[in-house]
């Protein structure tokens, strides 16, 4: 990694703490880090570790382009905020800089309908979904079998997600999910009560690798849908079954989009 010593990295950062990990990792490799965002240092974890702090908003693409040229950035990176990822991707395209995914790949993985279609193409199982019809008279939801989970197709961070056990709850949840979707699109799925797992993959030079699988344990709900995790246990008790039945299909699926 010595070839990175002295390189200059512009990091788009907000309140998300993952950008701070990016900055610290880059600095360990001798990279000079410039962190930008219009929030105060106290609200931006990445700024606490940066070699240089800027205040250009991560929402101002023109100003970001000017800043990247001014600081002579060799590369541009961000944390896990979906908004910041999209802005970083757009900025890299403007400046002809590399980024870890393309717009096409991002549009597949960040859109629940697109991602489920990719899964189906590669015979990776997905949860059953329902379709409702909106008319001038309202929404025909007679096809639903409760409980269902309602989500914005292209939302993030758990916003706009609801579990519904009856029609009254569904109608309210449907409008709520639409309000969280940039395109006003909603996906309705069977609500599955089962073990919760998390699976991590790394993609390098077009090759996919399963890197980790954990069991996720959640606290009891306090009335909100988003339950907070109590613990992640590695490796998952389902790891062997997953490797034997699904992993190769998922690897091939990710490799199919580059």
Name each model feature, range by range:
Residues 1-105:
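ATP-binding N-terminal substructure of ATP-dependent carboxylate-amine bond-forming enzymes
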Residues 18, 42-43, 138, 170, ...:
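Flexible, glycine-rich phosphate/dinucleotide-binding loops
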Residues 19, 86, 158-159, 197:
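Glycine/Thr-rich phosphate-binding loops of Rossmann-like dinucleotide-binding domains
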Residues 44-48, 63-66, 107-114, 160, ...:
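Short, charged, surface-exposed secondary-structure boundary motifs
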Residues 106-187, 193, 204-205, 235-251:
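Active-site nucleotide/adenylate-binding loops and adjacent lid/helix of ATP-dependent enzymes
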Residues 190-193, 197, 201-258:
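ATP-dependent carboxylate/phosphate-activation module, predominantly the ATP-grasp catalytic core
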């Amino acid at each position: 990694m010595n070839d990175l010593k002295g390189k200059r990295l512009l990091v788009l950062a907000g309140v998300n703490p993952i950008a701070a990990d990016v900055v610290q990792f880059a600095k360990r490799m001798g990279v000079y880090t410039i962190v930008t965002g219009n929030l105060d240092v106290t609200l931006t974890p990445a700024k606490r570790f940066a070699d240089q702090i800027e205040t250009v908003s991560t929402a101002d693409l023109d100003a970001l382009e000017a800043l990247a040229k001014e600081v002579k950035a060799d590369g541009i990176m961000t944390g896990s905020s979906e908004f910041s990822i999209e802005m970083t991707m757009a900025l890299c395209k403007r400046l002809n800089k590399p980024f870890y995914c393309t717009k096409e790949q991002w549009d597949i993985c960040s859109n629940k309908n697109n991602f489920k279609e990719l899964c189906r193409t590669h015979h990776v199982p997905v949860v059953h979904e329902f379709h409702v019809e909106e008319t001038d008279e309202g929404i025909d939801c007679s096809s639903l079998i409760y409980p269902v989970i309602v989500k914005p197709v292209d939302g993030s961070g758990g916003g706009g997600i609801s579990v519904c056990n009856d029609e009254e709850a569904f109608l309210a949840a449907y409008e709520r999910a639409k309000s969280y979707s940039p395109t006003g699109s909603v996906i309705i799925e069977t609500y599955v009560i089962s073990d919760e797992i998390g699976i991590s993959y790394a993609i390098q030079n077009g090759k996919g690798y399963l890197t980790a699988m954990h069991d996720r344990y959640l606290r009891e709900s306090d009335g909100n849908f988003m339950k907070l995790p109590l613990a992640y246990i590695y490796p998952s008790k389902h790891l062997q079954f997953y490797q034997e039945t699904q992993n190769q299909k998922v690897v091939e699926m990710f490799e199919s989009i580059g």
